Every structure is written in structure tokens, then in C-alpha cells.
Amino acid sequence: MPPQPQIMVDLQFEQYMPDPDLETIAKLISQDPGLSGALLKLVNSPHFGLSNKIGSIQRAVNLLGSRSIINLINAQSIKGEMSDETIVTLNRFWDTAQDVAMTCLTLAKRTGIQPADEAYTLGLFHDCGVPLMLKRFPSYMEVLEEAYAKAGGETRVVDTENRAFNTNHSVVGYFTAKSWRLPEHLTAAIANHHNALAVFRDDTARNTQSQLKNLLAVLKMAEHICASYRVLGNQAVDHEWR
């Protein structure tokens, strides 16, 4: 996923400081889904041999250190070249991803049902398939607006996408998150974030299902609070909200 241009400017400025501050770098990286994904993919790779996968940006930055982070930033800046038109189109996505992530963090802290750092990661990455769909399908944003308009009852946002493209941003986001080596419970939440009603109706007592419900409860509430339906779907009401 292409990184947000202004974030790259701020990160490159920090890396040229005599003593780059890891906390500042982590905060900047946390604002961008593309950079965060590349970071977590790296730190969770077999090279580091971690027994438990990391879902926290700050922990990943602390583990890697400034030199590896700077190399990652430089690599992403090369991959992130986009047309001005694409940058403008994706501004809505970047802004909403950050808002939802911060709201997930707050909700997780207040309720205590989910680790706050993982809730933040889910909020940041849940729509990571959107810019990839847009890159592949120029008409994607128009279809996404139609999808939000038709959502409700038994019709999911992803159903409209499936009819138009034979795939959807939840599926693309799931495989992207897996390629970043995010923990399995986070990738499952990304895959199901427009299938929440079916998940909530499932009375299976498995611990993994309970964890998925908690993640989706935090995420869907954050999406509603941040009006994702208005920003991404161009709708006056949230047809998914019940």
C-alpha cells in the first residue's frame, strides 16, 4: 500500500536528526497503514524468530531500532510514488483510517475487552484493501459508494463489490494483512468487518469466536462514531448500524 506523502516527509526529516527519536518515529508510522504494515511484516518475519507475533507499532520500532526503521522508510518512499489524482482520492481513506484507529484505541481502553495497541492496529488496517482496490479498479470509489448505499438487512457492503469485481476490499485486506504477518485474530477481524452481523449471531463458544466478536464490536462502534459511512460511502446514514 502506498504511504501517505506528508508522513514520508516528516519521517525523513526525523531520520536526518543527529539522534532519531524512536517514540516520535513510532507515532508517525502509526498514522499510516502502508508503513505500519511494512513494519509489522518485517518484525514478524522468520528472520526475527519471535514466538508471538507483534501487533504493536511502538514495540516493533523498539525491537528493530533506528537503522532498520530508516531503511524501511527509504524503501517505502520509493514504492510510494503516485499520481496527484490518486493522492487526492486516497486522502479520505488515510484520514478515516487514523480516526477509526484512535477511536478503537479509546474504546479498548475504556472497556478493557481488547488490548489497546491491537485495537489501534485493527482500526488502522481494517480498510487496507481500499487503496489496493482503487489501484486495480479506477471506478472503485463509485462502486464503494453504491455498496454503502445498498447495505442493510441481509445485504453487506462487500456483496455489491463482489458483483462488480468478483472480490472485495475485506478479502484483499485479509490477504494483505496476512502478507504483513499480522496475528491471526486481527486478520480474521479484517476479513469479517463487513460480516459482523453473521459473526454476532454465531453462538459458537470457541475462544477465538469470542475474541473476534470483541474485536468487531470495538471496530464497528468506532466506524459508526467516525462516520465511515459518510466519509467513504458518501451516505447520510449508517445502513450497517443496528
Describe the residue ranges of each PLM region.
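GAF sensory/regulatory domain recognition
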Residues: 146-152
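Conserved alpha-helical "signature site"
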Residues: 1-145, 156-239
